[in-house]
Every structure is written in structure tokens, then in C-alpha cells.
Amino acid sequence: ATPRFVDIDLTTYLIDSDKIEKVINTNTRCILPVHLYGQCAEMDKIHRIADAHNLYVVEDCAQAHGATYNIQKAGSFGHASAFSFYPTKVLGTYGDGGIVITNKEQLKDRLNRLRSYGMDDTSSAQEHGYNSRLDEIHAAILRKKLTRLEDYIYSRQTIAGRYRDALADSNIIQPYVSANCTHVYYLYVCR
């Protein structure tokens, strides 16, 4: 596939959903919104566009563990959603790792093959694949840390509040939080 880039909304730094349809053509297969810096993209608009053009939605949730849009969690909107567990992420382990989630059976089967050298349950390679399995130690760390995800988010939101207060009287443009979103502040990006 050839990516077609869509500019950002300068207020939120997220994909400008009003510009998506301008880049859709007959070769377009999916829309890949990035939930950047800890805030979700406008998923209702994105889904309306995807439905109108019969496109898949694949969410990039690498920076948005626990973020919400209209009370719904990041990663629950798309046909597939990817999360990073790099150590600096809101939910990170002590090395590289990630996960792709889906409720589409056929896609799940393909993803399982791709992460395991292209092999299926019979240990027969069906296609080119990778060694992308999360090892047991990192899975155990994540399982334990997952129980504290809300605490990590609260801590980040508290620190963001301190930044907001400290910078309130400056000319610095601080992060905008959409009214229908919960921001988890993976980064506190200012201009």
C-alpha cells in the first residue's frame, strides 16, 4: 500500500478529519488515525468517512493507553488497533514490545501467523513472517503493570495540571483537550 498523508488539526495536533476525504482514491484501503500524545482522534467522524467509502480503520494507540473518546477507550474503535509497550509509554515494559488487537477472526489468524515466522498451527510457513512474539517476562511485567494503569494515568494528569498552572500566564500554547476526550498525557507538547 502507498500511504496518503492527511495534515493535522493545529489545535489538537491530531489528524484533521475534515481533510481525510480529499486524499481518498480508488486504491485507498484503510484510514490509520494516530492517537497522538495521549489524546484520541475524532473517531466518530473517521468512522463515518470509513463507512461511506467501505474502508477499514486501524488505530495507532501507541501513545494513548487508557485515553477515551466519548467514554470509549482508545483501541476499541478500529478493525485493528496497535499498542506499543516501549518503556516510556503510559503502559510500558522494560524492553520493546507491542500488541495488535482485533475482533476480526480472519485478521487475527493472519496477525498470529505474521508474528510467528508466518507459521500456522501446523508449524508450516504460510507466508513471510517475523519473530514478533512478546516474551514471557515482558508479558508478566505488563500483566502486573496493567492493574495500575489508572494510577499511571492519574499521575500523568496531575503532572500535566501542574504544568498547565505554571505556564498559565505565559505565551506558551499548551495542549488542547477536546471536551469529549480523556487525555493521558503521554507527552505534554507546547508551542
Q: Where on the chain are the PLM-derived regions?
A:
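Short beta-strand->loop structural element characteristic of the AMP-binding/adenylate-forming
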Residues: 2-12
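Structural motif
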Residues: 3, 80, 97, 185-187
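PLP-dependent aminotransferase class I/II
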Residues: 7, 16-18, 22, 30-34, ...
